[in-house]
Amino acid sequence: MKAVIADGQNGVEVISDAPKPTPEKGEFLGRVIRVAFNPIDWKTLYNASIEKGTVGGTDFVAVVEDVGEGVDRSKYIGATVSGWAPGPLDGSNAAWREYITLDVNLVYFVPKNITPSQAATLPLTFTTASQGLNQYLGLPLPPTDGSKNSAQQKWVLVWSGSSSVGQYVVQLAHHAGYKVIATCSPHNFDWIKKLGADFTVDYHDPNVVEIIKKATDDSVFYGFDAASFPETSTLAVKAFSSKVKDGKLINILSSPPSPRSEVKIIGIIDYSLFNREFNFFGNKIEPIQASYDHAVEVYKKLTGWLQEGVIIPNRVKEFDGGLQAIPKALREFASGKHSAVKFVVRID
């Protein structure tokens, strides 16, 4: 079986003798037809400390060919599903290979109204967005009956609204009934507003904090920093309302000190949804049952949200060529010379 692995020289290479996995109890075996890139893919594989031979890849779309014990064959065999695997943190269960196995509860069925490439843009970053906004901040998920959540006068600030995570945070916050203000580059303003932002701000503007406060009438009470750099988190916290007493800003991975005692920065790690422990370059990531339960709930509802147009996938930059195309495409992705698009490689 072909797979893409760390080559031990801060790069990746394609091999043809990787073992084909076998589904265990509660799992499926799928033939991978699409993979999408996330920053963790290149940041882990382009790293001298990663073990040579580690298989890479997180987001995938696959056609189910077999299932393990306890899984309804009539429901899954032949179905097209999408999810994300632990990837480089667990090289035995990663997406960049011809076949993949995973817990059937951690994938969603791809609806007919979106393409496999669009489907590949969702798993990891949508999970991250929902984990932060819905699980940790407690904002309601979009209804599944066509109704709407009640409107709120409070604002949610989304820093880096045009990132993959940010685009899904904007949509989820909008459907939660909150007003949304997002930072991004001006050329992405229209797209981010289409996704649900009420106001967009150029994060390059030296007065970005003052602009946010004025636009929201000093009413930002929740935030999600999808960039999660120390400087972006500091600016985001400063933009919170002067009236806030228990503000919360979601940060991916880390929890840096907050410049305001009344605003807490909450670091989230989406790997906690897997029922096993990971070592993230010396930092232990332990499983959290609530994160697994939340992910299962979200994946059950995601197919319907996509069918109804409640959730819009990221825009796609697609690469042909199968697994052999990944090394070159990954280098382009790592260069950062792209905006508001998700890199997807066709494997079939």
Curated annotation (Swiss-Prot):
A Pfam entry, by short name: ADH_zinc_N
Record-listed E.C. numbers: 1.-.-.-
One function term, GO molecular function aspect: zinc ion binding
Cellular compartments per GO CC: mitochondrion
UniProt subcellular location: Mitochondrion
Domain of life of the native organism: Eukaryota
Enzyme class: oxidoreductase
Keyword tags: Mitochondrion, Oxidoreductase
Major subcellular location class: mitochondrion
The keyword Amino-acid biosynthesis appears for this protein: no
SMART domains tied to this protein: PKS_ER
Family membership: Belongs to the zinc-containing alcohol dehydrogenase family. Quinone oxidoreductase subfamily.
PANTHER family xrefs: HYPOTHETICAL OXIDOREDUCTASE (EUROFUNG), ZINC-TYPE ALCOHOL DEHYDROGENASE-LIKE PROTEIN C2E1P3.01
Protein name, per record: Zinc-type alcohol dehydrogenase-like protein C2E1P3.01
